[in-house]
Amino acid sequence: CADKKPQQELTPWGTPVGEVESMDGSDDEESDGNAADSDAGAQAQQRGLSLSDIQDNGELIMLTVNGPTTYYDYHNHGMGLQYLLCEKFAQQIGVSLRVEECKDTTEMIQKLQKGEGDIIAVPLPRHILKGEKSSAGKNKTAAKSVSGDSKTINLLFCGVTPDKGKTQWAGVGGNKSLADTLNGWFKPKLIANVKKEESFLLSTASIRRHVYSPFLNRSKGVISRYDHLFMRYSGTARMDWRLMAAQCYQESCFDPNAKSWAGACGLMQIMPSTAAHLGLPMSAIHDAEANVAAAARYMAELQGHFSDVGDPAQRALFALAAYNGGFHHIRDAMALTRKYGGNPQNWGHVREYVLRLTQPAYYGDPVVKYGYMRGTETADYVDRIRARWSEYCGGASFHESYRGGSRGPHIGRGADSFNGAPVKSKRNYQRKYHI
């Protein structure tokens, strides 16, 4: 695909360098009445909620931006180093954590000033605020008000500092109790510990499996003890039963009792929220047939979301990607593909932009509505299922035909255009189903 994206230096959270150097707002022409709040209200905003107020409310409001190290949604769970650190701090003070996602640093400071958040949980470089150290202390910076009036807001840098003081979280200057608690709680080793925890959560090792399910009968082509279920429900899913089997292996290694840290359960690793949407009670989520049947309905639903993708084989790949990475993220990648001259109905083209949604220049693009995604994981998920399906079919590649039948669509031999990328032929492959 043609890629004409101009190169631009970005901060770690995706804001173009220099964009927030001037904190002056664009509302200078508003009337004085709109520019000024009551003095009492302004003072209350600048003080912010005290630690005891936050604890009484039972909620800490985290202001952040979307990104791989700040905050992103991963299978309906918050993820990102700064989010996980803030979550641990919220647990420490006995409250829940609510995330307010902002588009840039300026919006975070605006919301903090208005009392719409308690803490900016993004390491802010002090120099971007163009402030001078106040007499109140070395960690307090007075910055021009982002609302454009004559008021100032005191930011109190506190808590997490990943780089020896060059950057740090920030709260409202008057909120000393919250800042002192954050400073007392934070220890540099927390960053390393949380990084290890995040790495584990994102690994397959975090899925608790109870059985190992090898290929049952190579000579007779029996893939698993659940083949009859894949055959029965592949028509509902609108996919070849062996493709469904390959997806199941990727999800759970054919373990009906598998459970991930995020709560995904069963053969097809269905999330509780998805189970509720599909009418699958949690009491039945580990039942093999109920789980496969629900997953088949969900795959059919996802394929319906991609009804604009004309080729059924391509549509199946888009649905697999959405099963793993989320429908909205795949739509974002399709929008990028269209913008930069690719074919948004070809998985091979869209896959490239799924991968690029890990980069600030792309997940910050105006056509992207849902931000950062772990694109490498989703691309790998589809690649592995596709390769395993090829093994199950005796070395066929994903392409030539995808026609309906009593057991669901059948993917024929030959073919490398199923995902738009070539696949090395495995016709001489001696059925080594290494599972």
What are these regions (language model features)?
Residues 257-283, 290-301, 385:
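Substrate-binding/active-site groove segments that recognize
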Residues 205-254, 289-292, 306-310, 403:
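Export/targeting segments at the very N-terminus of extracytoplasmic proteins
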Residues 377-435:
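Low-complexity, Gly/Ser/Thr/Pro-rich intrinsically disordered linker/tail segments
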Residues 38, 183-222, 338, 389, ...:
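Ligand-binding clefts/hinges and TM-proximal coupling segments of bilobed small-molecule sensing domains
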Residues 167-171, 317-391:
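Catalytic and substrate-binding regions of cell-wall glycan-acting enzymes that process beta-1,4-linked
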Residues 44-47, 52-53, 69, 79, ...:
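Acidic, polar ligand-binding/catalytic clefts
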